[in-house]
C-alpha cells in the first residue's frame, strides 16, 4: 500500500511538471516548481528522518537542522565536527 501511495505521488508530481511546462506560465515559476517537486520526491524516497540539533556531532551539512552547518570551530584539522550556526 505504501509503494502504491508513493507511486501515485510521483505520478502526480510528474503530471504537474508536465502541465506547467506546457502552459505559458512564468519560467521562474516553472523552475521553482521543478525544484520543489525534486526535493519533495527525494524526501519521500528517504522517508522520515530527524535532524541533528546544534552542538551535536555530525558528518554532513544535510544532517543538521535548518540554518546549521556541520563544521569545526576549534582547529582546522578537527576530527569531530558539530552542527553549528
UniProtKB/Swiss-Prot annotation:
It comes from the Eukaryota. Residues 24-49 form a propeptide. Expressed by the venom duct. Pfam families: Conotoxin. One of its GO terms (cellular component) is extracellular region. Transmembrane segments: none annotated. This is Conotoxin Vx15a. It comes from Conus vexillum.
